[in-house]
């Protein structure tokens, strides 16, 4: 059966030889992001010196015989990767090494994402959508956005979907219900140990999760810190950071924007300009969002914070603000 394509999108993926990209690329080629009727002009980027590994990734994609892949190239040139793209998935980042402080990581990645933002500014389409995965993701996303003034600030996203998925699963397991019975899962703030999984907004079988779970102490003192520290727990258990789950979360995060479901809430880090919650402008901050018929998103308005959640959000806001201040001095 010949698949009829309705459109083709140009897509760049950085960090193309890494573990997350290795899982994500095949989901992308399969149609999990843009749908089964959308062709893909794919450019895979990684650093000079990794050409041989990139060629191996290309071999596997070629061998997968994906009908949606209309063109495929691997490159060590950001200009080549970002030229005329509709979407970029910025996965590559400097990893946090043993004994490395978060401030050291901010400095190293500040240079990487400043350059990538500058090249996006000169090379990508003005309405390109940019998804940042490399940590510290909120601040890396802000750096790239600040270096790309030609692009629409609203189209920069930092990934919080993995945190959302973790919370979704924990609530379903605790309530002993299928995953599709859980909705309105919200992550506020930074993707870090200070993120805010807001259980007060979540619904289980259409009822408030707080009522269904019936154990506020578990929500505050077991579930919340478990989600905040899940990444570290995976590293401790596996010896490596989350990869397959992160790739799936990235595909879902992008799909929520490109192929939205009616009324679906999704958590994503976006530019805080004109937000309805009083968060200072010019930050990348995690909000619950939903898509509009126009193809744009809106931050879900009108949600109330109890004292516990409000205090946690302030802590996360302080962290993001401090990270921004630190990189602004670089």
Curated annotation (Swiss-Prot):
InterPro entries: L-lactate/malate_DH, Lactate/malate_DH_C, Lactate/malate_DH_N, Lactate_DH/Glyco_Ohase_4_C, Malate_DH_type2, NAD(P)-bd_dom_sf. The active site is at 191 (proton acceptor). GO terms for biological process: malate metabolic process; tricarboxylic acid cycle. It holds the Pfam family Ldh_1_N. NAD(+) binds at residues 15-21, 109, 116, 133-135. Substrate binds at residues 96, 102, 135, 166. Its EC number is 1.1.1.37. Belongs to the LDH/MDH superfamily. MDH type 2 family. This is Malate dehydrogenase. The gene is mdh.
């Amino acid at each position: 059966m010949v698949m009829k394509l309705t459109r083709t999108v140009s897509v760049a993926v950085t960090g193309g030889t890494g573990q997350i990209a290795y899982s994500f690329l095949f989901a992308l080629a399969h149609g999990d992001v843009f749908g089964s009727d959308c062709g893909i002009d794919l450019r895979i980027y990684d650093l000079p010196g990794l050409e041989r590994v990139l060629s191996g990734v290309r071999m596997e994609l070629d061998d997968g015989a994906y009908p949606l892949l209309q063109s495929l190239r691997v490159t060590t040139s950001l200009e080549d990767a970002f030229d005329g793209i509709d979407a970029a998935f910025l996965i590559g980042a400097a990893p946090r090494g043993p004994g490395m402080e978060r401030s050291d990581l901010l400095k190293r990645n500040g240079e990487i994402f400043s350059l990538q933002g500058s090249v996006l500014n000169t090379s990508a389409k003005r309405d390109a959508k940019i998804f940042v995965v490399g940590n510290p993701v909120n601040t890396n996303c802000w750096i790239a956005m600040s270096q790309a003034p030609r692009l629409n600030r609203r189209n920069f996203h930092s990934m919080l979907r993995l945190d959302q998925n973790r919370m979704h699963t924990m609530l379903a397991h605790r309530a002993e219900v299928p995953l599709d019975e859980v909705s309105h899962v919200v992550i506020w703030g930074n993707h870090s140990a200070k993120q805010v999984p807001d259980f007060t907004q979540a619904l289980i079988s259409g009822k408030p999760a707080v009522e269904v779970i019936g154990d506020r102490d578990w929500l505050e003192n077991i579930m919340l810190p478990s989600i905040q520290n899940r990444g570290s727990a995976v590293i401790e258990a596996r010896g490596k950071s989350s990869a397959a789950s992160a790739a799936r979360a990235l595909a879902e995060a992008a799909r929520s924007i490109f192929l939205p479901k009616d009324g679906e809430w999704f958590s994503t880090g976006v530019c805080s300009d004109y937000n309805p919650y009083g968060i200072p402008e010019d930050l990348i901050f995690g909000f619950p969002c939903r898509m509009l018929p126009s193809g744009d998103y809106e931050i879900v308005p009108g949600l109330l914070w109890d004292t516990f959640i409000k205090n946690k959000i302030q802590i996360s806001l302080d962290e993001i603000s401090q990270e921004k201040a630190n990189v602004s001095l670089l």
